[in-house]
């Protein structure tokens, strides 16, 4: 079992089937990482479990049925969101062909009908009004907005997974730091930076 009963309650993953698929997903990462460099070679089993907890914690902040995970890499958090939210459409975007190949295998192996894969850069992808953007801290929030602001709209909300509060200095945008429930489990600083248009 991936999580004890207390952690299951905090993370909202009491369904045995979902837990099994999450476990299968982690095993696929470990297997493919030997040849594909999906995550750092130094990543331990405990590190992967912590990544999983971080990604599961974002579920509490999701209030839409369309999610866009940019720079998804090995599928964190997109695959985790898709596995635990079967009614939510999750688009996973990455410019690395090898990582998209891995995600294609994961989608088929775990029968993820609500996951859609896109081999492209965020600069070349137009975000729909309904999509919530999620991402790990690939870059600073300021660099991220500079990169994607031509492709988003006033309704776009971004949730960036971070370990500390960060400010944004681009005119027209605001941020809100949200504490993650993962802090209770990991005993480490964890949170989300909510980035949105000032009008939103």
Question: What are these model-predicted stretches?
Answer:
Residues 88-91, 95-200:
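S-adenosylmethionine
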């Amino acid at each position: 079992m991936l999580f004890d009963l207390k952690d299951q309650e905090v993370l909202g993953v009491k369904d045995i089937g979902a837990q099994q698929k999450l476990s299968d997903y982690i095993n696929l990462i470990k297997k493919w990482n030997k040849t594909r460099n999906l995550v750092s070679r130094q990543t331990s089993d405990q590190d992967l479990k912590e990544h999983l907890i971080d990604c599961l914690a974002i579920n509490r902040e999701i209030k839409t049925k369309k999610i866009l995970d940019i720079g998804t890499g090995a599928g964190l958090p997109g695959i985790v969101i898709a596995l635990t939210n079967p009614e939510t459409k999750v688009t996973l975007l990455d410019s690395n062909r090898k990582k998209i190949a891995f995600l294609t295998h994961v989608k088929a192996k775990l029968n993820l009908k609500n996951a859609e894969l896109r081999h492209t850069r965020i600069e070349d992808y137009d975000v729909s009004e309904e999509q919530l953007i999620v991402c790990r801290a690939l870059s600073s929030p300021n660099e991220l907005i500079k990169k994607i602001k031509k492709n988003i709209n006033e309704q776009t909300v971004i949730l960036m997974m971070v370990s500390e509060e960060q400010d944004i200095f681009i005119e027209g945008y605001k941020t809100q730091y949200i504490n993650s429930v993962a802090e209770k489990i990991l005993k480490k600083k964890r949170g989300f930076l909510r980035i949105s248009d000032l009008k939103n």
